[in-house]
Amino acid sequence: MRAFVVRARAAPVDSQQFLAAIGHEAHTEILAHTLMNTIFVAQSHRDDVVVYLVLESTQDFSRTICFRSNELGHIGGFHEQNLTNKIAKALTVSKGMAKEQLREVEAGITVRTVSFEKLIQELAEDYQLYMLEKKGTPVRDIEFAANPCFLLTDHIPMPKKSFNSLKRLGTQHINLGPKMLFASQCVVLIHNELDMRL
């Protein structure tokens, strides 16, 4: 099972604000692009992939939206607007939730009021964590664990205070090349690297 976590520090948890932020400073469209490239392939979708989108611009609790490729029903169309609407629907469902609650949105999609830090602690029990870092080990030199979990961010870098807690959880730093890429591009390269090893 491959897992991907996208930490979206500027993304609002209010569904209307989320949709209004597309193409603006928060760049919420990044989440749809990343989701598209993580789960879908030509004419189909990947098996055994889980994507966690952690939206952090909130007055109360972060929202973690989980997409499980094996459980997804008919998504309704392979385009940005449809995927942003799925995210917005999850945010609407999450309205009024207390801390660390879980709600099902539809088949294969859930939303939780859980922080990035708490989510990563949970995932570290079942996955080997990998974080993209320009000083990390080149991806072709990594021997990946059977259950890899890749940590990415939107256009706002991972805060320095997160590095120590990630280090304590055994997170390995990997490098995809000399250029800084969008999260949506990174997931394609990661999938390709893992696919070539099958």
Swiss-Prot record:
Coiled coil: none
Cellular compartment(s): Cytoplasm
A single GO cellular-component term on record: cytoplasm
EC numbers: 2.1.1.-
GO process annotations (BP): tRNA methylation
Gene Ontology MF: a single term: tRNA methyltransferase activity
Gene3D superfamilies, per the entry: 3.40.1280.10
NCBIfam families named in the record: PRK02135.1
Family in the record: Belongs to the methyltransferase superfamily. TrmY family.
Name of the molecule in the record: Putative pseudouridine methyltransferase
